[in-house]
């Protein structure tokens, strides 16, 4: 599943 990738993107957005 691409859940990991999606989660990573969400985290980066949150940090920004």
Swiss-Prot record:
One cellular-component annotation, GO: T cell receptor complex
Localization recorded for this chain is: Cell membrane
Give the signal peptide range.
none
UniProt keyword annotations, A-Z: Adaptive immunity, Cell membrane, Immunity, Membrane, Receptor, T cell receptor
- DNA repair as a keyword of this entry, yes or no, is no
Which Gene Ontology terms describe the biological processes this protein takes part in?
adaptive immune response
Its annotated function is as follows: J region of the variable domain of T cell receptor (TR) beta chain that participates in the antigen recognition. Alpha-beta T cell receptors are antigen specific receptors which are essential to the immune response and are present on the cell surface of T lymphocytes. Recognize peptide-major histocompatibility (MH) (pMH) complexes that are displayed by antigen presenting cells (APC), a prerequisite for efficient T cell adaptive immunity against pathogens.
Per UniProt, subunit arrangement is: Alpha-beta TR is a heterodimer composed of an alpha and beta chain; disulfide-linked. The alpha-beta TR is associated with the transmembrane signaling CD3 coreceptor proteins to form the TR-CD3 (TcR or TCR). The assembly of alpha-beta TR heterodimers with CD3 occurs in the endoplasmic reticulum where a single alpha-beta TR heterodimer associates with one CD3D-CD3E heterodimer, one CD3G-CD3E heterodimer and one CD247 homodimer forming a stable octameric structure. CD3D-CD3E and CD3G-CD3E heterodimers preferentially associate with TR alpha and TR beta chains, respectively.
Q: Which protein are we looking at? A: T cell receptor beta joining 1-4
UniProt source species: Homo sapiens (Human)
GN (gene name): TRBJ1-4
